[in-house]
Regions:
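Histidine-acidic metal/acid-base catalytic patches
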Residues: 27-33, 41-57, 180-290
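Charged helix-capping and loop-helix junction motifs
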Residues: 75-82, 113-120, 148-158, 210-216, ...
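Active-site-proximal loop/turn and secondary-structure-junction residues that shape catalytic pockets
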Residues: 38, 63-65, 102-105, 138-142, ...
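A short acidic, helix-capping loop that chelates divalent metal ions and anchors anionic groups
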Residues: 67-72, 105-109, 142-147, 206-208, ...
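Conserved beta-strand positions in the central sheet of alpha/beta enzyme cores
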Residues: 60, 98-100, 135, 173, ...
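N-terminal pre-domain/capping segments
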Residues: 24-127, 184, 192, 278-290
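Active-site acidic/histidine proton-transfer and metal-coordination neighborhood
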Residues: 91-92, 105-197, 205-206
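Bacterial Sec-dependent N-terminal signal peptides
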Residues: 1-28
Length: 290
């Protein structure tokens, strides 16, 4: 009788041990972050405690506005301000997973006369803050679906960015409007391991493409990070066109790991209720991925 009880006890201990290891592995494989800009805290130190409150592990910090300036309105190159951000991040156990050059959503990366300084400033900031990923959206003016004639300019400029990023030991993740096959071809033309796809779920979803197939086409090695939300309208848990469990199954099979970054998918009735929108989406993502 005693021997039987000991066997049961050993079995339970082993089960709990392996369960703990699986949970730890899942947490290491998928981490959840949020975009400071979309939390209405663009380059504001208050984004750090807010990130902790809504339950994410990381932040994508914005480089600041661009407009017609030669470079971003970036406070993070100020030593004292940057030190405050780093201290707060340590205090709240928040990781800066990426720096976003969101100014290029509106400004033209492919047509801007002096694009190099802005990229250099982003990479310099990344190095100073030990951030390994930069986000570069090609934006409305470099939409390669609507303006395929811009492809040569985009490839040439990305090759230059790739050399800069490679020399610094960082990766720049790009967002385009191309489907996965065309984006994979673009990455091949650029030919740099320092230029990858920063995949955004909303792009295939709003264009009627198969999100899960697109992930598989691009493949594990080409995707550096993921904006894991749809357009604004409903929260992730209420989104009927986005099967997050199927997303996880797809990423698991691909062997992909990294940061899943909450950007949009805000409730249209309360778009500025940051704690509700990001708190709900963070909890939902953690319930599936962690």
């Amino acid at each position: 009788m005693m021997m039987q009880q000991n066997k049961i006890l050993i079995f339970l201990l082993l089960f709990l041990c392996f369960s703990g290891i699986e949970k730890l592995f899942a947490q290491q494989r998928y981490n959840i972050a949020a975009v400071d800009l979309m939390m209405l805290k663009r380059q504001k130190i208050g984004a750090i405690p807010l990130a902790s409150q809504v339950g994410v592990q990381g932040l994508e910090l914005d480089m600041g506005g661009l407009g017609n300036r030669p470079t971003f309105d970036n406070q993070l190159l100020n030593d004292s301000i940057r030190a405050q951000f780093l201290q707060q991040a340590k205090a709240f156990n928040i990781t800066f997973c990426s720096l976003s050059m969101s100014g290029y959503y509106a400004q033209s990366f492919c047509g801007r006369e002096n694009f190099v300084q802005s990229i250099e400033d982003c990479i310099r900031t990344m190095k100073l803050m030990n951030v390994k990923v930069g986000f570069l959206p090609l934006g409305v003016q470099c939409d390669l679906v609507k303006h395929p004639e811009l492809m040569e300019s985009v490839v040439s400029r990305l090759q230059r960015v790739g050399k800069m990023a490679s020399a610094a030991g960082v990766v720049i993740g790009i967002e385009t409007t191309l489907d996965a096959s065309a984006e994979k071809k673009l990455l091949k033309q650029v030919g740099s391991n320092a230029i990858k796809s920063y995949f955004n779920f909303s792009n295939p979803l709003k264009n009627g493409r198969d999100l899960y197939k697109e992930l598989k086409i691009l493949g594990r090695k080409n995707i550096i990070q993921i904006h894991c939300t749809d357009d604004d309208g409903v929260l992730l848990k209420d989104n009927t066109r986005l099967d997050m469990k199927k997303v996880k199954q797809t990423l698991d099979k691909m062997g992909w790991s990294g940061w899943l970054v909450l950007e949009r998918s805000r409730d249209a009735k309360e778009p500025n209720n940051v704690k509700k929108n990001f708190g709900s989406n963070a909890a939902y993502m953690k319930s599936i991925f962690q």
